[in-house]
Amino acid sequence: MSNQAAKLAKFLLEIKAVKLSPSEPFTWTSGILSPIYCDNRMVLSYPEVRTFVAEELAQLIQREFPEATRIAGIATAGIAHGALAADKLNMPYCYVRPEPKKHGLKNQVEGEMNPGDKIVLVEDLISTGKSSFQAVEGVQNAGAEVIGIVALFTYGFANAMEKFVNAGIPVHTLTNLPTLTKVAAEYGFIQDNELATVNRFAENPSAWGESL
C-alpha cells in the first residue's frame, strides 16, 4: 500500500464518496449486488481532492505511458477526471461513449481522435470492466490504439483483471479496495462486521449477492 494510495482512500472516505450498506445492498449497472458503492463523482466537489487526483493521474500517465499521444475519458464519470489530467499534461483530449449516439453525427468518440493515436483511457473506477472494453472498442473503431487504462479506484475483481491481461491492456489505478478497507478500519470508518462483509464480497461478488 503506497502512501498516495492510502491518502486517496482516506480522502474518498472523508468526502463520503464511499458508502457502505450491507443490510440493503446497492445494485450496480451490471446487476451485481454490493455492500459497497464508490461514487468518485464526489471528488469533483472538493477542490483539494480534485487537484490531488488530477495531479496523481497525470503523474501516473506520464510515468507508465510516456508514448501516449492523446488522453480519452470514458463517459460519463471518467470525462471530467480525464480532462483535468490531460490539462495538467497539456495533452490533446477527447471522450468515448459506451456506444455511438443514435442521433446527430452518431459519434462514439467526442472530440478529435486520429488514426494511429496512442490512447490512454481514463476511468473513474473499474469493477467488471464492461465500460472500459466498450470504450476500447470505440477507440479501435476510430483507428487508434489503446495503450493503457488508468482509473481512480478498482475493486480488483479477478475476472475483470484477467480480461485486461488477456487483451494485453495494462491497467493502473490510484487506489484499490484492499487499501480502502485497511484505511477505513484504521481510521474507524468501518466496523469489524462491515469489514468482514466487504471482504467476503470482494472474494466472490456473485456468490455474495446470491447468498442474501
Task: For each feature predicted by the language model, list its residue ranges.
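PRPP-associated nucleotide enzymes
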Residues: 1-122, 130-212
